[in-house]
Amino acid sequence: MAVIKMTDLDLKGKRVLIREDLNVPLKEGKVADDTRIRASLPTIRHALESGARVMLLSHLGRPKEGEPDPAASLRPVAEHLATLLGQEVPLAEDWLDGVEVAEGQAVLCENVRFNVGEKANDEALAKRMAALCDVYVMDAFGTAHRAQASTHGVGQYAPVACAGPLLAAELEALGKALEAPARPMTAIVGGSKVSTKLDVLETLSEKVDQLIVGGGIANTFIAAAGHPVGKSLYEADLVDKARQLMDTARANGGEIPVPTDVVVGREFSADTQAVVKRVDEVDDEDMIFDIGPETAQRYAGMMREAGTIVWNGPVGVFEFDQFGEGTRKLGEAIAESDGFSIAGGGDTVAAVEKYGLADRISYISTGGGAFLEFLEGKTLPAVAMLEARASD
């Protein structure tokens, strides 16, 4: 993708406004999980070491615009960031009128969502943000699918708008996986409902060699193949759609395989007994919570042979260990594969962490909704803006 990269610019002495995704969970006023903060560090360090005057933007939570809420303040993030960087990172509360920052220093601007007009991509607000800087850096892939003042509007009016290293790496990895994938290409799409992932399923069914479905989504496909699903979560009104998707995959030389065995339980709880059954032996009281060992082995074989793997969603209720074997086996097969693998989505990343796979997956996306929209083939507003500015 043709965008200007921050790493190609001379930043010395420049006022550099960087939009990161520092929307992290807090517990008792402290950062509970700093994964997103750590992901942003290479970008921030590069700007500081280049002698830039760095201003950082992010949202946190969902406060009501125009009503600053102490519970959504970025102060704990500023304190945590200061520790990681080994230098002071002041929090600027009233930053829209200007920020005092020296070369090689960073200031974190208070929650962008405290400003009226942020979510609506208000032009006047975007222009005030743009007036703060010489260079605007969009580095928050996780919010690239939202056209908001701090992710889109500001970039339209800043003197220079570019992609930060984290965003550039995301686009490169996703481009490699989707635009010219090494074959065979395999995708895993898990989740509770077909309806929430319908666009992804439709797009991928035309592209991939194998589209493996998991979770509640798989139950709808199991029903579409004519098997009983008992009391399992599934969408009866989308059974015909599931059949269509299977036909589409076949017409494009691919397949959406259906499990031959499953793991069932009688209730959704951590201590319910797990029972392996053939897919045609599920009874009226059963709930399907995972793929069975035979199916897991078959799918794992596909992973090991794949040239490209896209993973979005677990294949079972992996939060309960007795229903996590399918996800674990597929995750380990992806980690062992010589193919290029990309994983994204909150539950997927949680599974990657649980089974200790992080350093063996080629790329782990920081985006949830943005990752999904990219898989759907949609244009991300922030990326479209950067492309337009690159051709100014």
Curated annotation (Swiss-Prot):
<dbReference type="GO" id="GO:0005524">
    <property type="term" value="F:ATP binding"/>
</dbReference>
<comment type="similarity">
    <text>Belongs to the phosphoglycerate kinase family.</text>
</comment>
<feature type="binding site">
    <location>
        <begin position="21"/>
        <end position="23"/>
    </location>
    <ligand>
        <name>substrate</name>
    </ligand>
</feature>
<keyword id="KW-0547">Nucleotide-binding</keyword>
<dbReference type="InterPro" id="IPR036043">
    <property type="entry name" value="Phosphoglycerate_kinase_sf"/>
</dbReference>
<dbReference type="Pfam" id="PF00162">
    <property type="entry name" value="PGK"/>
</dbReference>
<dbReference type="GO" id="GO:0004618">
    <property type="term" value="F:phosphoglycerate kinase activity"/>
</dbReference>
<dbReference type="GO" id="GO:0005829">
    <property type="term" value="C:cytosol"/>
</dbReference>
<keyword id="KW-0963">Cytoplasm</keyword>
<feature type="binding site">
    <location>
        <begin position="59"/>
        <end position="62"/>
    </location>
    <ligand>
        <name>substrate</name>
    </ligand>
</feature>
<feature type="binding site">
    <location>
        <position position="36"/>
    </location>
    <ligand>
        <name>substrate</name>
    </ligand>
</feature>
<dbReference type="InterPro" id="IPR001576">
    <property type="entry name" value="Phosphoglycerate_kinase"/>
</dbReference>
<protein>
    <recommendedName>
        <fullName>Phosphoglycerate kinase</fullName>
        <ecNumber>2.7.2.3</ecNumber>
    </recommendedName>
</protein>
<dbReference type="InterPro" id="IPR015824">
    <property type="entry name" value="Phosphoglycerate_kinase_N"/>
</dbReference>
<feature type="binding site">
    <location>
        <position position="146"/>
    </location>
    <ligand>
        <name>substrate</name>
    </ligand>
</feature>
<feature type="binding site">
    <location>
        <position position="197"/>
    </location>
    <ligand>
        <name>ATP</name>
    </ligand>
</feature>
<feature type="binding site">
    <location>
        <position position="319"/>
    </location>
    <ligand>
        <name>ATP</name>
    </ligand>
</feature>
<dbReference type="InterPro" id="IPR015911">
    <property type="entry name" value="Phosphoglycerate_kinase_CS"/>
</dbReference>
<comment type="pathway">
    <text>Carbohydrate degradation; glycolysis; pyruvate from D-glyceraldehyde 3-phosphate: step 2/5.</text>
</comment>
<dbReference type="GO" id="GO:0006096">
    <property type="term" value="P:glycolytic process"/>
</dbReference>
<feature type="binding site">
    <location>
        <begin position="345"/>
        <end position="348"/>
    </location>
    <ligand>
        <name>ATP</name>
    </ligand>
</feature>
<dbReference type="GO" id="GO:0043531">
    <property type="term" value="F:ADP binding"/>
</dbReference>
<keyword id="KW-0324">Glycolysis</keyword>
<feature type="binding site">
    <location>
        <position position="113"/>
    </location>
    <ligand>
        <name>substrate</name>
    </ligand>
</feature>
<comment type="subunit">
    <text>Monomer.</text>
</comment>
<keyword id="KW-0808">Transferase</keyword>
<keyword id="KW-0067">ATP-binding</keyword>
<dbReference type="GO" id="GO:0006094">
    <property type="term" value="P:gluconeogenesis"/>
</dbReference>
<keyword id="KW-0418">Kinase</keyword>
